[in-house]
Amino acid sequence: MTKSHSEEVIVPEFNSSAKELPRPLAEKCPSIIKKFISAYDAKPDFVARSPGRVNLIGEHIDYCDFSVLPLAIDFDMLCAVKVLNEKNPSITLINADPKFAQRKFDLPLDGSYVTIDPSVSDWSNYFKCGLHVAHSFLKKLAPERFASAPLAGLQVFCEGDVPTGSGLSSSAAFICAVALAVVKANMGPGYHMSKQNLMRITVVAEHYVGVNNGGMDQAASVCGEEDHALYVEFKPQLKATPFKFPQLKNHEISFVIANTLVVSNKFETAPTNYNLRVVEVTTAANVLAATYGVVLLSGKEGSSTNKGNLRDFMNVYYARYHNISTPWNGDIESGIERLTKMLVLVEESLANKKQGFSVDDVAQSLNCSREEFTRDYLTTSPVRFQVLKLYQRAKHVYSESLRVLKAVKLMTTASFTADEDFFKQFGALMNESQASCDKLYECSCPEIDKICSIALSNGSYGSRLTGAGWGGCTVHLVPGGPNGNIEKVKEALANEFYKVKYPKITDAELENAIIVSKPALGSCLYEL
Amino acid sequence: MTKSHSEEVIVPEFNSSAKELPRPLAEKCPSIIKKFISAYDAKPDFVARSPGRVNLIGEHIDYCDFSVLPLAIDFDMLCAVKVLNEKNPSITLINADPKFAQRKFDLPLDGSYVTIDPSVSDWSNYFKCGLHVAHSFLKKLAPERFASAPLAGLQVFCEGDVPTGSGLSSSAAFICAVALAVVKANMGPGYHMSKQNLMRITVVAEHYVGVNNGGMDQAASVCGEEDHALYVEFKPQLKATPFKFPQLKNHEISFVIANTLVVSNKFETAPTNYNLRVVEVTTAANVLAATYGVVLLSGKEGSSTNKGNLRDFMNVYYARYHNISTPWNGDIESGIERLTKMLVLVEESLANKKQGFSVDDVAQSLNCSREEFTRDYLTTSPVRFQVLKLYQRAKHVYSESLRVLKAVKLMTTASFTADEDFFKQFGALMNESQASCDKLYECSCPEIDKICSIALSNGSYGSRLTGAGWGGCTVHLVPGGPNGNIEKVKEALANEFYKVKYPKITDAELENAIIVSKPALGSCLYEL
Amino acid sequence: MDYNKRSSVSTVPNAAPIRVGFVGLNAAKGWAIKTHYPAILQLSSQFQITALYSPKIETSIATIQRLKLSNATAFPTLESFASSSTIDMIVIAIQVASHYEVVMPLLEFSKNNPNLKYLFVEWALACSLDQAESIYKAAAERGVQTIISLQGRKSPYILRAKELISQGYIGDINSIEIAGNGGWYGYERPVKSPKYIYEIGNGVDLVTTTFGHTIDILQYMTSSYFSRINAMVFNNIPEQELIDERGNRLGQRVPKTVPDHLLFQGTLLNGNVPVSCSFKGGKPTKKFTKNLVIDIHGTKGDLKLEGDAGFAEISNLVLYYSGTRANDFPLANGQQAPLDPGYDAGKEIMEVYHLRNYNAIVGNIHRLYQSISDFHFNTKKIPELPSQFVMQGFDFEGFPTLMDALILHRLIESVYKSNMMGSTLNVSNISHYSL
Amino acid sequence: MDYNKRSSVSTVPNAAPIRVGFVGLNAAKGWAIKTHYPAILQLSSQFQITALYSPKIETSIATIQRLKLSNATAFPTLESFASSSTIDMIVIAIQVASHYEVVMPLLEFSKNNPNLKYLFVEWALACSLDQAESIYKAAAERGVQTIISLQGRKSPYILRAKELISQGYIGDINSIEIAGNGGWYGYERPVKSPKYIYEIGNGVDLVTTTFGHTIDILQYMTSSYFSRINAMVFNNIPEQELIDERGNRLGQRVPKTVPDHLLFQGTLLNGNVPVSCSFKGGKPTKKFTKNLVIDIHGTKGDLKLEGDAGFAEISNLVLYYSGTRANDFPLANGQQAPLDPGYDAGKEIMEVYHLRNYNAIVGNIHRLYQSISDFHFNTKKIPELPSQFVMQGFDFEGFPTLMDALILHRLIESVYKSNMMGSTLNVSNISHYSL
């Protein structure tokens, strides 16, 4: 595991005269620049690019501060930007995809933030999230310039090939590109933003539109490196460590991504899916704390919005009952031991309500009233449910985080006697992860299950959903290289799934639906 | 400190043929028996007696489970009882003092408890408290006899010389006598009740009438021993250890009790005095727990009524921050160290609101709503207040408990170079205790302050209120024996306080107002 | 807080106890055995049950045996019962529908019993205003002191609220909201529930019982009758589903003619205070609101009474008070209400009054009997205590009489009239009793 | 939940933006600058401010400069403003008291402007029912599409509640209670508060504003007008104490003729549902109750809306729902409402809908403008979308018009009439519009 992390590492910047331009920029900048000129009949000043990501293992655990194993993929979002110099600045957005209608809004002259209407589901809201986090970064970076004066007006042309609602995190790609662009537009060519800063400010961006996600997607999009996957950690601090796959004897380690083409809009289904899961794991952490007589966060840390999480519970439990008062620093061996202990506690204290906790059940275990629990836990964002399945969700988070640690050990083992060893062991972890996502977290869907079973019986060693689930993409560990069976898997999926489910699918769509992703470069800039 | 405690020690029983009858019984039984016969024209079967008590030091800390130093005094409550054998049994109560009207009530035939109307202030309610705890003891002792059949009917004649509302705990004396009588009446001569059982069942008796006090009064009344004071501990378990005062060279250690004659009815002033203080110290414990991120009681122990107390906070604080997970066992040296630490924490976290916490302030520190705090803390018993003075009350409880430990060390020191050393040191602790009760707990009154200042300038080394305060009695450490100055103190009080405040006071009343109390025998029975 | 001083009458008075004759005490079932009987038990030497009457004498005999009432006689006829000189007080605890047909002849026969001093009748004192007026007149002519079981007036919470208001703790009353709930009158009816409480005219319904008790309590606390009122009475559930004990529907529907919702609004005579009431029939929903909420807003503070069930007169309520005590408040009787020492005038006082183990069902009736014995034995040594009084009105002392009941009946009559006529009625004159 | 789909109209439409002429937009003060202006800013290419009129032209000029309104012209006279062809939509955002005297001539002059399509008037559309009727008729004759700012209908919470009710989540509505609070109308008046809102007849008071907005929202959510209503209007505080910003009394009293309390109760046309309302004037008390509580009880579930201040149309509310989804519930339009997959029918569903950082003051007006542009550019591609519609009534689509305002005015008129006549009124006919 190369130790360098992204503290001072700068987001890569290229220009037309750069000796060798990274492939994504070389391939895609010319066309977006042409489209910009035809839309605004002016040349853009620069193009900001940020990729989508696939997550090999560790789903729905980033918002509990547990580490994950994503890698940036060859699909990305580009924003061609021209900085304007108007007295009352405004931002005009045009998207190559007609589905996203053209938008224009003015920048408040007093330098205040552009308001985001959280009750509305629109692509421009995601632009405004990137704009907001960049604006607050600039207010701290250069208060004299941005405290009470508006940002620069912009003309923006957006084009991306990360399929939306596919679980490859098109929203994070878009937000990171926008944040990078807004900082570059307002600080000028002389300022070079660090990856760490871009990652830090974008991990919370989607909260402004009401999606309470963790930071995996943005971290992978910003810190992606060619031929490197990423070990992203959120605690003790936010860190993304690139690493190469182990060298096997006669196979390459490659991951096939297959899109179920079932679109799942994280925002609109949030009340019954994504945001509900965040409420469930937060509640589980607090019920565990109440049962074992520990306080998740002391008076200072806790607040009406910060209720602590399952990683906090693990820490205060070990402080109280094992006299280890420093929080877990991510060390693998002690992590495996503690997560195993957590799974025991979950069985002990939550297994008696497998049918789910009603609001009254939870209020009783937390020793507070119905109204109190509702006010404190259910008003952070809209939710709708019959019961809260604390047992299943907590069991998934701890077992999935345990699997990530085991996966990291595999990835950092110098060598394997037989390639089969790696594929078998890593594949097993992925299959367990899929089972847990399906049975415990209930975020799979029939199409995902179908694709996984087909892939597994056609050469994939490990198949699972990737991203939030409820549709979107799946990822498969398939031996690559000459005698690999990538083609075999693609063949099987095409015939047994795509042509069956989508009889009228075109070859191009099929081409796009199944891809072999090489870890790609993270966010970068191309200055004209 | 004699190690024997009252596990198997039986409540002393005497009868007319006993060789030497204890003085209180010898003096008082004949007259009460005569009065019983004239009231019921029948002879009573036995007389139950229980004394009042004075507390040398350790006020308002028993309901926080901290130890205290009371001694039984020569004033007591006697109940002459005749057991009836009626089909539908009832209990008739006559009191020698006409102020307490005669009462009669039937015993429910199905063996259920006699209801106590907590909204009413009447002497018979205290009888019913004793009856209730005895009844529940009997239901466990002999379920087959008392589960669904009524107790025996009784004729009772009560007479006591513990002045009510004087802080010498007349209510505890009455309750202990009644509980002893009811058990004896129903179990017959063959059953001999242990002091431990009588103490255990009576410590919670007054809660049934709505006074949430600790167990000091009942423990002292039951376990009193001639020439011995008592070191009463509530945790780890309820224990009363008799000890003798140290032998001084040429003075006796004696305590003068002076009654302010200001009657303070604990029940009727409970909402603004006694019960309010119980709410304040319970709230203080929980605010401290929230501030330092510890949980007072784990899920199992805590309940809607049991909110934990300042001793629980000390224990969980040391578990969390000093890795000592076993609760404090009462050891003096470690107790002094910990209580000193607690006083530091109180300064650190509560001193910023010396003007008192509003309901909103408390709700905010406990991270719950106004309604939640009101529902959980303010509905256990009626309370009325403007602010909750958490800082002052917590500081008093911890400092007073610290003083008790120092007082115990003094009392168990083998010898003193000069008598003056003992009197000076013990007196100083008493005076600090009076200052803390006055300034921090605000449970003194002008008359108490006046009596204390007069006594201190006329030979008393230590003067303070005793019992709940807001009136009632004061206790003074005065060197006794030939060259003591008991007379000097009595003189001064009579002229500078009583004759001034109560010009028409009679000699008899004066005689009764100032007494030198020798530690007296605890509860006992006299069978005819 | 001095209302809670227990009367100093000895429960073993030197004088003879009040001898009580019961119509409707049945050891097996009914209201009296659950409330009147336990109350008398606690005051066993101030009240002594000496006579029982019920249409079937076997019932009385069985009750005497079951309860071992050593001093009680079972009377075969109403006449023999009413005229027996062994009775000082008659308690009528039977279905409201038979009040009139029992009490009128009873009063007549009772003329042969010189010892009869008290007539205690359960609310709602007859099913109509006319019947109530007749009973009242007959009792007045007969010259007995009357008692009605509007026992909500004796609840410690109501008395404490009345004390706070009368001592100026909330200043002038600004507005009042009441939301209540009458359990039986919803979509479902327990199969064992007696039919008569679902038929209009039997004197037991959402308006007469649930609203009646609560509005009497409100008037008593605020010491004011109403001046103008408007009401809308609803029967949106003409048919109810029968359910068994476990709440499962039996698939059978039964007719209901009593109302299942009451909207009532009006103004108090004192201060033209707006009062808004909504009483809902049906199973109390625990979802987002308590089932009984009385909010009283004042210029100096707020008072709130909350209960789990909708019946204020038999619930163990919680009283919340918060306000700045107006110590410059000239009390009605002119003298200065002493502000508790230690309070500084400007600051807000908070009070929460709740007695965790108070049994309201028995307790309120028990305290009503206590107030009767306080009056009978003049335990408070009130100089020249009159031998009788017509009505309690809004005094702390005494107990509610048939005149208080009559005034409440007139208000309920105007509720139905306002609904029927569709108009706001002036009711400021209903509180003048006229013989 | 599909009501929250953002219109797909591009904020940079290929067609020209709607040109807006403002009467009453003043950069320095007033309602429009705080709400209409920020809303238009967010839709900067669908609406373009092209004209301002105010009695003093300097105000218009100063506003154009301050807000840098590059396409706007300041008009010296109402006539020149109204007849200018550079305006597609006129927005009237001035004191209600001057609505009539401005809008009537404006409509007349506007006959010279063939481009005028929309007339947007702030609630309460004139100070009396007659004025409102005349304005409505004049606008209808002039043939413009009208808009009224009953923006509570656009609140995401109200729309979600409407959705839940219409999809059978609470079954049949059983009863409704509303408690609200109108800040200014209590014992104290901030010295800087404008005099006219305390004088009856200026179209701004507890009944017209606080009650008006809330009862319109209730009718919209429940899709029902009222059949019978009764009201009692109170002015118990004829004089208020003047206070400075920090709340200290200045020792000066000022007269108030607008009401400070409203009691309203009635029955909904659909289902004869009992509705009880109590609106209190004065500083919202935080003691024991929220300042706006709407409780809707149904046979299958309960809905509750709560807000901190008493103004439902500009508060960031919280919606609570709990109930068993009746999946066998035949929907109004016959088809079966799909139960979310994964729910089993019998079990109770709980929903809490709150958007922590939603700015209701700007947001609701912003969404009202959005619905105007959706209509104008037919963004939802509704086939044969009529060029005009008379009233929104209870549809999800569209926006409230002067007819919706007129119906609300008739209800408010009957509130005052019911109080004055002391009678319950039948209002089931006020919702039939007659040209």
Swiss-Prot record, chains A, B:
The record marks 53 as: Transition state stabilizer. Optimum pH is 8.0-9.0. One of its GO terms (cellular component) is cytosol. Keywords: ATP-binding, Carbohydrate metabolism, Galactose metabolism, Kinase, Nucleotide-binding, Phosphoprotein, Transferase. The active site is at 217 (proton acceptor). Alpha-D-galactose binds at residues 53, 59-60, 62, 213, 217, 274. GO terms for biological process: carbohydrate phosphorylation; galactose catabolic process via UDP-galactose, Leloir pathway; galactose metabolic process; positive regulation of transcription by galactose; positive regulation of transcription from RNA polymerase II promoter by galactose. Its EC number is 2.7.1.6. It comes from the Eukaryota. SUPFAM superfamilies: GHMP Kinase, C-terminal domain, Ribosomal protein S5 domain 2-like. The modification Phosphoserine is found at residue 381. Induction: Expression is regulated by the GAL4 transcription factor. Pathway: Carbohydrate metabolism; galactose metabolism. GO terms for molecular function: ATP binding; galactokinase activity. ATP binds at residues 165, 167, 169-170, 264-266. The keyword 4Fe-4S does not apply. It catalyses: alpha-D-galactose + ATP = alpha-D-galactose 1-phosphate + ADP + H(+). The keyword Nucleotide-binding applies. PANTHER family: GALACTOKINASE-RELATED, MEVALONATE KINASE/GALACTOKINASE. Belongs to the GHMP kinase family. GalK subfamily. Galactokinase is a key enzyme in the galactose metabolism where it catalyzes the conversion of alpha-D-galactose to galactose 1-phosphate. Can also induce the transcription of the yeast GAL genes in response to the organism being challenged with galactose as the sole source of carbon. It's striking amino acid sequence similarity to GAL3 might explain its GAL3-like induction activity. This is Galactokinase. It comes from Saccharomyces cerevisiae (strain ATCC 204508 / S288c). The lineage of its organism: Eukaryota, Fungi, Dikarya, Ascomycota, Saccharomycotina. The gene is GAL1.
From Swiss-Prot, chains C, D:
The gene is GAL80. This is Galactose/lactose metabolism regulatory protein GAL80. Keywords: Acetylation, Carbohydrate metabolism, DNA-binding, Galactose metabolism, Repressor, Transcription, Transcription regulation. To K.lactis GAL80. Present with 784 molecules/cell in log phase SD medium. GO terms for biological process: galactose metabolic process; negative regulation of transcription by RNA polymerase II; positive regulation of transcription from RNA polymerase II promoter by galactose; regulation of transcription from RNA polymerase II promoter by galactose. The modification N-acetylmethionine is found at residue 1. The keyword Transcription applies. One of its GO terms (molecular function) is nucleotide binding. One of its GO terms (cellular component) is transcription repressor complex. The keyword DNA-binding applies. It holds the Pfam family GFO_IDH_MocA. This protein is a negative regulator for the gene expression of the lactose/galactose metabolic genes. It binds to GAL4 and so blocks transcriptional activation by it, in the absence of an inducing sugar. Monomer.
